[in-house]
Each structure stands twice: as structure tokens, then as C-alpha cells.
């Protein structure tokens, strides 16, 4: 992903578009990155299967567009989606945070009944636009 991104942006004048927040809690810049041809780098990484959607409310301006790109990459078997391998059968999602957890994860047990969503696979969770919890790392072969 890093090399692909570098090939896209190196030597280019890019435009940054900010959403509701300009930085995350760690001081990192949150932005949509556009190339001179108008294409969105974030979307190109998703289409290549080199990234997955990781929403951070309230920064959801392009969430449907980006999720559509992720779903297309999944459907076409691009990048990380090419040789998908499921190891576990059930995951718990949190509708409020759009994160999913392994069933035995302490964070999964804390998800309220109102926000609890059960997925039969990681694939189903990603397809629904959820991203993996960083507490229990239900990633399988997907690198962070």
C-alpha cells in the first residue's frame, strides 16, 4: 500500500479535503487526498484492495463512495481480498463504532444489546462496512 501510494502521489501536487475533523486523537491529519486528475487517492487504495474502510465519526462525508470501492475490490478479488481465508465463524459488531470483534474478546462482551450485530464471517463484516477492532485484531491474514 505504501509503495502504491508513493507511486500515485510522488511529484504530484495533491489537494486535501477535510471532513468534520482535521486531526485524530494522535495528531495525525485526516483528509481525503485528490490527484490533479481529480481522482481520490483514498478510493484508489481501496479499489486496489490495499486498504479497508476505517470510519471515524463524524468524518463520514464520503463513506458510501469509499464503501462502494471496498465492496468492488472484494467482489473482484483485488489485493488483500484475493486469497481470503476465514478462520473463525462468528464475530460481534458494534453498530455505534462500526468495529467488529472476535466473539471471545472482552470488547465484544461490552457491546450493548442495542448496538450488537452478529456476523457469520469477517468477509460479511467488511462487506457491511465494519472494520476490525484493534483490541483483539480479528484480521487473519490482513495486515494492519
Indicate residue ranges for each PLM-predicted region.
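Small beta-barrel nucleic-acid-binding modules, primarily SNase/OB-fold domains
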Residues: 1-144
Amino acid at each position: 500500500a505504501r509503495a502504491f501510494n508513493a507511486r500515485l502521489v510522488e511529484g504530484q501536487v495533491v489537494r486535501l479535503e477535510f471532513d468534520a475533523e482535521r486531526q485524530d486523537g494522535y495528531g495525525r491529519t485526516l483528509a481525503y487526498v485528490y490527484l490533479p486528475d481529480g481522482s481520490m487517492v483514498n478510493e484508489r487504495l481501496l479499489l486496489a484492495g490495499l486498504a479497508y474502510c476505517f470510519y471515524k465519526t463524524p468524518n463520514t462525508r464520503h463513506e458510501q463512495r469509499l464503501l462502494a470501492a471496498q465492496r468492488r475490490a472484494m467482489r473482484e478479488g483485488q489485493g488483500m481480498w484475493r486469497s481470503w481465508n476465514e478462520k473463525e465463524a462468528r464475530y460481534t459488531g458494534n453498530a455505534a463504532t462500526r468495529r467488529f470483534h472476535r466473539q471471545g474478546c472482552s470488547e465484544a462482551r461490552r457491546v450493548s444489546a442495542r448496538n450488537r450485530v452478529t456476523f457469520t464471517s469477517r468477509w460479511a463484516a467488511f462487506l457491511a462496512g465494519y472494520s476490525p477492532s484493534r483490541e483483539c485484531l480479528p484480521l487473519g491474514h490482513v495486515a494492519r
